[in-house]
Amino acid sequence: NNSYYVFIGLSNPTGAPTLAGYGRTSDWNTSDKTPAPTDSFSYRAHSGDTMMFGKKISSANIRRIIRRVDWTSGSRYEIYRDDYSASNQSPLTKANRLYDANYYVLNSDFKVYVCIDNGSTGDNVLGNISQDEPTFTDLEPSKAGNSGDGYVWKYLFTVSPSDIIKFDSTEYITVPNNWSTSTDSQIRLVRENGNSDTNLNQLKHVYIENAGTGYANGLGQEVDILGDGSGAKARVDVVNGKITDVTVSAGGKGYTYGIVDLGTLNSNVSATGRAKLIPIIPPGLGHGSDVYSELGTDKVIIYARFDDSTKDFPIDTKFAQVGVVKNPTKVCLLYTSPSPRDS
């Protein structure tokens, strides 16, 4: 098994030949300029020269993290889409990939939600402003209130109180460890709901890219969603020949692509009046089945506390070097004072 340690080093000399700064002449504390690391093989090879103390990292002191996106009333958020790219950037952040878009939020109770719908269409690409803070823990996507802001959210998890205390950051959100095997009741419910045969690649949202013209007027007209899955249906509202709303009435299962079949509604639609409806494909098996891939947890945060509880760590010294080392080995255990005759 591999072992990892947080280390600190490059202590600041005080001018006197103290043990902490022995053999070095730089005095970065007086200039208040911490020496910057150098991106070179030489720097990496010699980074161990100034390491002084280390602390072993346990699973309790490391978490996956994602960018922190706080829910704020009056702000806009982007919807989860499986097809953000350089040619189809997210509308608000202009992200070339999903993980750089603001498609999830952290609420005031440290609950995390994915945005399934924000009222956006091809005629309203930025979507609506969010007015209702999501607070529910329902397994199915839901609206957060009665303002009519058009937002639909999917609850994923709640940051635990212990993680808030240990890892709280203004820049990042911690994600629970061991998602696929966790026995936490709330995590298990969300995970199993996403993993269930019923929710296997189940569709939750259809985006109206183009409302079209000439369609048969009517509210709640049910149509099939075709593709490599089965069983999905949608209810379509048409007013004055234009599609104004599409709601998934049956999510089906097994979809990696989908096409809304408007054949029963388009008898009077011209070639230039055809609508474009895009079923949004969920992540993996379904929302919540694997939050690491759904949220893009490509970073970790590590907690390590150095104090004088063992009486061998100088708490009155500043350090300019911090890092992580894998499988360190002991090269010596004793310090021997050089002989006066040594040259």
Language model feature labels by segment:
Residues 149-337, 341-343:
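Conserved, function-critical positions that sit in or immediately flank catalytic
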Residues 1-198, 274-276, 286:
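Tryptophan-rich substrate-binding surfaces of secreted polymer-degrading and adhesive proteins
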